[in-house]
Every structure is written in C-alpha cells, then in structure tokens.
C-alpha cells in the first residue's frame, strides 16, 4: 500500500491496483491481492484451481436442486443452509475416486445417507422439536410414500416453547438428479433436467397441543405424469415438517416461527 502525494485525485482501479481515499482524505494506492483473473483463467499454473472452481460451481447447482426439492419447506429455515448443502455436495463428489478432479460425478443415488436427516433449522431441529415414532414405507415404482405416525405425548415429546395451541404435520416430495461433467459444455449439469416443478405437498390436519392426537397415516405421491422423467439417476426426496398454529378469527392459522423439518427419506 502506498500514499499518493501531490496533485493526484484518483479513485477506482487500474489493472492490478486500486485507488481510494481513506478516512483522513488521503489518496491511497493498493496492489490487489492474489493472481489476476486472466492468469487464473488461462495460465497452466492455475489449472488445478480451475478444476476445483468448476467442481464448486457444480456443488452450488446441487444446492439449488435440493432447495427446489424442498419446496415451501425452505421457509421453515432459521438460517441460510445453502452453504451446508454445498458442503454435502462436495462430500459426495469426494467419494468419486475413479474420475479425476474437475470431472468427478456427484451421485446422490449412491450416497443417500449424506442428505438424509438433513435439518432445515438449527434452533428447532425436528427430532428435538417432536419425538414421535414414524414408520415410513416407500414405493418408488408408484412414486409414493406412506408414513404412520404414533401418538405424540404432549408433555414429554413436543417442545412447544411459545405455547401455541395447535400443530400439524406436513410432507413434501421432490426430485434431485445426479450430476455429471458435460464434456460438451464443460460444466456440471443434472443428468435429468426439468424436474424443478416435480414436487407435491401434503398438509395434515390441525391438532390441539393440549390433547394427544390419534394414530394416523399420511400418504404422498407424485403424479404419474412425472414417471417418464424418473430414471435411475433421479432421487425422490421425502421431507417432513411440523408447524405450529395460532388462533385467528376462531380458526387455526400457521405461526411464522417455532416449527422445523428435515429430510426423512431418499428413495
């Protein structure tokens, strides 16, 4: 960094350098840190960097695919979990030991456990929010899942710290395709595209937090029109959430906070 004296009155930047005024009004010149973008894009010395950048962009796209599959459950989040999903994508990519860096695949179909049990909230994690026994049955051929929910005990199992009078269970099912390095575009792309709108939401009944609700079953299914797009490279992502409700004009209304959700099953 250098201080410029004399008749100069500069701002902005010249290749490799930035000019600005500090808080005392002095003209300052600073050399930009790190290699310039042209070298990163073209120099053989940064080939490995370019490969890692390419994979990172693929992981960013993986995060977008997941958030699309979560649908409205994204609104439950109490933090920006984009970076967490990018990290999961990178962990899955690191499992590919056959292909070289920059060409490694991102196959969720082979590593479903990396995304299962992913929580949408940090403060209100689903398993701590409501401890209920959930028996999940999946039918990939018919794009369907069924969950049986046992009686939750209000005193011991539901953390209702805001004392809401109602709660309900919701399910959403969406699709996430495996990803690969497309040699034509030299970018990471989903193997199966146009799955962004392939989501279905099922909303359960409102139950009082003061009364133990009955044992009940919830079923969720994608329309059969999606079947032709669901190849072996596509994951069906089933997520579950709990929402609390407050009273509005004598009827239950969704509360804007207090709930939580997670990825229940990938099949």
Q: What residues fall within each predicted segment?
A:
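Residue-identity detector for glutamine
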Residues: 53, 61, 75, 159, ...
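Long, polar/Ser/Thr-enriched low-complexity segments
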Residues: 1-124
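Charged linear interaction tracts used for macromolecular binding and regulation
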Residues: 93-235, 239-245, 257
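Extracellular fibronectin type III
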Residues: 249-267
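Intrinsically disordered, low-complexity regions enriched in small/polar residues
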Residues: 10, 19-22, 48, 190, ...
């Amino acid at each position: 960094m250098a201080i410029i004296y004399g008749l100069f009155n500069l701002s902005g930047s010249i290749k490799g350098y930035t000019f600005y005024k500090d808080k005392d009004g002095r003209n300052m010149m600073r050399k930009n840190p790190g290699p310039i973008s042209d070298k990163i894009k073209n120099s053989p010395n940064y080939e490995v960097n370019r490969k890692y950048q390419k994979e990172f962009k693929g992981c960013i796209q993986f995060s977008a695919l997941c958030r699309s599959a979560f649908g409205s459950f994204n609104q439950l989040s109490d933090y920006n979990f984009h970076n967490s999903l990018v990290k999961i994508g990178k962990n899955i990519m690191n499992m590919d030991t056959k292909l070289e860096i920059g060409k490694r695949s991102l196959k969720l179909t082979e590593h479903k456990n990396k995304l299962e049990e992913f929580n949408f909230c940090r403060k209100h994690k689903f398993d701590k929010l409501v401890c209920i026994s959930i028996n999940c049955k999946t039918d990939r051929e018919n794009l369907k899942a069924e969950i049986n929910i046992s009686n939750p005990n209000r005193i011991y199992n539901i953390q209702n710290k805001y004392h809401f009078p109602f709660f309900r269970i919701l399910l959403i099912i969406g699709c996430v395709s495996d990803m690969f390095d497309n040699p034509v575009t030299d970018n990471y792309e989903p193997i199966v595209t146009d799955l962004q709108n392939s989501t279905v939401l099922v909303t359960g009944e409102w139950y009082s937090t003061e009364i133990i609700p009955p044992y009940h079953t919830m079923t969720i299914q994608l329309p059969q029109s999606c079947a032709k797009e669901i190849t072996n490279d596509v994951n069906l992502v089933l997520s579950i959430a709990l929402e609390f409700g407050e009273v509005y004009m004598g009827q239950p209304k969704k509360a804007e906070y207090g709930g939580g959700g997670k990825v229940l099953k990938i099949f």
